[in-house]
């Protein structure tokens, strides 16, 4: 048994001075493995008298447990020290500034649409929407556009068949609203529209916002005041606004709206073609025929309507000279609007 005590003391000393988990495993194999020192002692039990074997066997088991406990404790200690060292090496200085993350932003046309909606919502207008695939009636007939009108030509309109087409304006939303509710009506209708046109200032798909107000006693003076206040709120400037007589089948009288050039302040430049004025929208009093076709009495109610291209206003607000830039998905361009 003195030999057993010496083996245990030797094993515990080795465990105590080990600084490596791998070396610790070698110690375990040396003392507790299949051919280990303590395992060999256990095999000598057969040489002892039968009455001594239980007592000696118990002592050997206690010795093995003592060594195993020491091994486990030292292993936990070494692993904890290794983890602490690794954490110290990988420590993050939380006082350092974080790395900036590239974030997206709203498209300039989306910004413009939301800005227009906000301007009109402040004065009681609601946002109305409708289908982009329209029927001929709501896109043309109900808006007093007869069959021989040039807008119905194939080179101006995308047709699916004789009756279905991609809407050429958001005016059908106004018609559907008048069909479903009686005055007073006060709405703006933003959305995508489609026309067979593509160049520096035109796109086959673009965004339009139209507005409609129908009530009793509505006059052109109300239309004029509404548009003037909207344009000044949108551009955040006191702009000169002028109305030029024009023609639209669904309004009478009709007008084109020009503003003083926001680039040169009316002095004349390339953008305004030296005129000092920029065309921004069309408008007019709702034609009595349009009201009748929507079951609204034109003798009792009057209304005005207006329409503008969102890309056109975005170009003027942000100083963009090519409409196609809005649809190129070039991050160098779009990143300027975050």
From Swiss-Prot:
The keyword Magnesium applies. Its cofactor is Mg(2+). Binds 2 magnesium ions per tetramer. It holds the Pfam family tRNA-synt_2d. InterPro entries: aa-tRNA-synth_II, aa-tRNA-synth_II/BPL/LPL, Phe-tRNA-synth_IIc_asu, Phe-tRNA_ligase_II_N, Phe_tRNA_ligase_alpha1_bac, Phenylalanyl-tRNA_Synthase, tRNA-bd_arm. GO terms for molecular function: ATP binding; magnesium ion binding; phenylalanine-tRNA ligase activity; tRNA binding. GO terms for cellular component: cytoplasm. Keywords: Aminoacyl-tRNA synthetase, ATP-binding, Cytoplasm, Ligase, Magnesium, Metal-binding, Nucleotide-binding, Protein biosynthesis. Its EC number is 6.1.1.20. Tetramer of two alpha and two beta subunits. Belongs to the class-II aminoacyl-tRNA synthetase family. Phe-tRNA synthetase alpha subunit type 1 subfamily. This is Phenylalanine--tRNA ligase alpha subunit. It comes from Pseudomonas aeruginosa (strain LESB58).
């Amino acid at each position: 048994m003195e030999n057993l005590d010496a083996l245990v003391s030797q094993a515990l000393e080795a465990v105590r001075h080990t600084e490596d988990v791998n070396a610790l495993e070698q110690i375990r194999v040396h003392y507790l493995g299949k051919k280990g020192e303590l395992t060999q002692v256990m095999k000598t039990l057969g040489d002892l008298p039968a009455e001594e074997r239980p007592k000696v066997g118990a002592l050997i088991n206690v010795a093995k447990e003592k060594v195993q406990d020491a091994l486990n404790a030292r292993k936990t200690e070494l692993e904890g020290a290794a983890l602490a060292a690794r954490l110290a090496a990988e420590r993050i200085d939380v006082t350092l500034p974080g790395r900036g993350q590239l974030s997206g932003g709203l498209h300039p046309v989306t910004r413009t649409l939301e800005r227009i909606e906000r301007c009109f919502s402040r004065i009681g207008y609601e946002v109305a929407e409708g289908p982009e695939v329209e029927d001929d009636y709501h896109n043309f007939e109900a808006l007093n556009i007869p069959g021989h009108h040039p807008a119905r030509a194939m080179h101006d309109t995308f047709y699916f068949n004789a009756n279905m087409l991609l809407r050429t304006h958001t005016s059908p939303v106004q018609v559907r609203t008048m069909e479903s509710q009686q005055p007073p009506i006060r709405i703006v209708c933003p959305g995508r529209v489609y026309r067979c046109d593509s160049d520096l200032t035109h796109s086959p798909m673009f965004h339009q916002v139209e507005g409609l107000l129908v009530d009793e006693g509505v006059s052109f003076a109300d239309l004029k005041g509404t548009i003037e206040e909207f344009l000044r709120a949108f551009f955040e400037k006191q702009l000169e606004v002028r109305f030029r007589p024009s023609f639209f089948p669904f309004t009478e009288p009709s007008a084109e709206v020009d503003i003083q050039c926001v680039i040169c302040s009316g002095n004349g430049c390339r953008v305004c073609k030296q005129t000092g004025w920029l065309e921004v929208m069309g408008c007019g009093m709702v034609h009595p025929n349009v009201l009748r076709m929507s079951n609204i009495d034109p003798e009792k109610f009057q209304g005005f309507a207006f329409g503008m291209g969102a890309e056109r206003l975005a170009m003027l607000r942000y100083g963009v000279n090519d409409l196609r830039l809005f649809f190129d998905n070039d991050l160098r361009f779009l990143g300027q609007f975050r």
